[in-house]
């Protein structure tokens, strides 16, 4: 009986079938061979079961596909193909669909995280979130700022500080009488307070200098202030050079508001001497105090005169950093206005008065009200903007990178010179031996040991004489 009767009309040679099966079994991982094998036998009707012959002729009625649990988009390429079966017993093989965005948890960084980004942002790495990490760590740690106020008594230093930070730092202050002021010397007082605003903590330290400029003879009255600044640098240098550097408290003075009296025709000799003595140690911001005692034209003339004298005497006050070319135009205009306002003409007040139906901080006069936070009356808002809102970090950076580094370099140079000098002295002492006394022979020594000691003594004396002769010849030669 012919074996090909089972293959009616579409018989395939037996050797071809066996060769294809053998090739398929030899490499089951080759997709190309699998496709070729299926293609060779796809047209053979006898390869399918009898009920499969009518599958293509039946009308295909779409059936609802069961919903599967969601899966990420990256797993789509691993879904196995679904092979069609008869409509009587039709089955589907498919991987779960992707997880819907509403069902999966949200990233703490929002759109900056590729987990929540769109398909176009899948190549996003994520290091752009570093500013967020630094911000979170900095807010958790808090910030330090030390502000020094210097100037004569009665110029409104304490009042201005309270107005700047909306707090009362001098509630325990005791006002001295006339006799006590005569005997008063320059002192350094510290007022520390923790301020919190919108979750940001600031450890503010105010350094006051009561008694400065109040004496009849103010010669070198700036020395206690300079010594205090150097002491803070020295303490920070020691902490930085120690073993435990994790929790170093920064008490370095970051800014000094120097108050200039509105009475006179510019800077006084004491003002010039103070600023020249401290401009290499701290950021100096000149303040024209009690600006409400001057008319607007007088304020302009006073500012211009002070700026000319500062430049004439070579005083280096705090310099505002230059704006970058890509900065916003509004920021550039604001920065230019701050630079032109030096020295800041300010008014301080702790009293709240009512002006035009509003309660403001100001001073009440018979002719009207002077508002502290009115830009048309004084430069208080500009000073607060510069000191707190825009340039506080730059003041700290200049202190760390310029003033403290200068002090640190001087300390290292002094230590190096001392070490080199000590080494040279020890080396000269060892070579000359003049400072080392010749030891005496201990009693009870045997004759041989005594003889060796005396020979060494004679040798040392000859070497010393030769060294003295060489040194004498060198001096005569040079």
From Swiss-Prot:
GO molecular function, one term: GTP binding
Binding sites annotated in the UniProt record for GTP: 151-158, 185, 290-298, 348, 363
Organism superkingdom: Eukaryota
Any one cellular-component term (Gene Ontology): synapse
Region (Disordered): 38-115, 425-448
PTM characteristics: Ubiquitinated by AREL1.
SUPFAM superfamilies, A to Z: P-loop containing nucleoside triphosphate hydrolases
Biological-process GO terms, alphabetical: cell division; flagellated sperm motility; hematopoietic stem cell homeostasis; neuron migration; spermatid differentiation
Region listing for G4 motif, in residue ranges: 289-292
UniProt feature, compositional bias: Low complexity: 95-108
Coiled coil start-end: 446-478
Subunit structure: Septins polymerize into heterooligomeric protein complexes that form filaments, and can associate with cellular membranes, actin filaments and microtubules. GTPase activity is required for filament formation. Interacts with SEPTIN8. Component of a septin core octameric complex consisting of SEPTIN12, SEPTIN7, SEPTIN6 and SEPTIN2 or SEPTIN4 in the order 12-7-6-2-2-6-7-12 or 12-7-6-4-4-6-7-12. Interacts with SEPTIN14 (via C-terminus). Interacts with DYRK1A. Interacts with SLC6A3/DAT and SNCA/alpha-synuclein. Interacts with STX1A; in the striatum.
Similarity remark: Belongs to the TRAFAC class TrmE-Era-EngA-EngB-Septin-like GTPase superfamily. Septin GTPase family.
Annotated protein name in UniProt: Septin-4
């Amino acid at each position: 009986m012919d074996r090909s009767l089972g293959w009616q009309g579409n018989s395939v040679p037996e050797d071809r079938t066996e060769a294809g099966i053998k090739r398929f079994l030899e490499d089951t991982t080759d997709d190309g061979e699998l496709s070729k094998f299926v293609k060779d036998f796809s047209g053979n009707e006898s390869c399918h079961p009898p009920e499969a012959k009518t599958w293509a002729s039946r009308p295909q009625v779409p059936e609802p596909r069961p919903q599967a649990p969601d899966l990420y988009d990256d797993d789509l390429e691993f879904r196995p193909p679904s092979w069609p079966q008869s409509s009587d017993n039709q089955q589907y093989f498919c991987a779960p669909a992707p997880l819907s965005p509403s069902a999966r948890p949200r990233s703490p960084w929002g759109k900056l995280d590729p987990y929540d980004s769109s398909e176009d942002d899948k190549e996003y790495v994520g290091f752009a979130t570093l500013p967020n990490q630094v911000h979170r760590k900095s807010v958790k740690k808090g910030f330090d700022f030390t502000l020094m106020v210097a100037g004569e008594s009665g110029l409104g230093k304490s009042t201005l500080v309270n107005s700047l930070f909306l707090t009362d730092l001098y509630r325990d202050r005791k006002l001295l009488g006339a006799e006590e002021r005569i005997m008063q010397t320059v002192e350094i007082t510290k007022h520390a307070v923790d301020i919190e605003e919108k979750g940001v903590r600031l450890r503010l330290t105010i350094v006051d200098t009561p008694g400065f400029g109040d004496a009849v003879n103010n010669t070198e009255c700036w020395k206690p202030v300079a010594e205090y600044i150097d002491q803070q640098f020295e303490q920070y240098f020691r902490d930085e050079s120690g073993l435990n550097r994790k929790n170093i408290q920064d008490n370095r003075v970051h800014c000094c508001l120097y108050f200039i009296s509105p009475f006179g025709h510019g800077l006084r000799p004491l003002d010039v001497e103070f600023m020249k003595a401290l401009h290499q140690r701290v950021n100096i911001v000149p303040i024209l105090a009690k600006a409400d005692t001057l008319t607007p034209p007088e304020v302009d003339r006073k500012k211009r005169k002070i700026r000319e004298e500062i430049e004439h005497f070579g005083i280096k006050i705090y310099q505002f950093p230059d704006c970058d070319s890509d900065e916003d135009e509004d920021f550039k205009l604001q920065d230019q206005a701050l630079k032109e306002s030096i020295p800041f003409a300010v008014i301080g007040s702790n009293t709240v008065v009512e002006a035009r139906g509003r309660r403001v901080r100001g001073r009440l006069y018979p002719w009207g009200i002077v508002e502290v936070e009115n830009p048309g009356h004084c430069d208080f808002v500009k000073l607060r903007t510069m000191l707190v809102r825009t340039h506080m970090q730059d003041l700290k950076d200049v202190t760390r990178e310029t003033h403290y580094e200068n002090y640190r370099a001087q300390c290292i140079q002094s230590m190096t010179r001392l070490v080199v000098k000590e080494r040279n002295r020890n080396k000269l002492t060892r070579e000359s031996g003049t400072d080392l006394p010749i030891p005496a022979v201990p009693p009870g020594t045997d004759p041989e040991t005594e003889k060796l000691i005396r020979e060494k003594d004679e040798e040392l004396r000859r070497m010393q004489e030769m060294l003295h002769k060489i040194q004498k010849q060198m001096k005569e030669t040079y």
